[in-house]
């Protein structure tokens, strides 16, 4: 299941979050951006359950992550 995860990050933590997110299984790439959100991550997981685990159990628990918004690719 492919998705874009938009991540808002506490000031001063963007580089740390990009580095940590990039190393997670299922994350294809993560990029810091100007403006909000601070980080865009493109992920690809086998199914919705794995996507949920990646976002809720891993990304949202990283130090500096304030909020995530997930957009599932439909095409």
Task: Go through each PLM region and give its residues.
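A compositional/biophysical signature of low hydrophobicity enriched in polar/charged and small residues
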Residues: 1-75
């Amino acid at each position: 299941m492919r998705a874009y995860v938009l991540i808002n990050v506490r000031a001063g933590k963007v580089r740390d979050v990009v580095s940590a997110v990039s190393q997670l299984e299922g994350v294809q790439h993560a990029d810091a951006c100007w403006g909000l959100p601070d980080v865009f991550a493109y992920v690809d997981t086998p199914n919705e359950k794995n996507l949920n685990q990646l976002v809720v159990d891993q990304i949202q628990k990283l130090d500096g992550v304030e909020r995530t918004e997930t957009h599932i690719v439909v095409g």
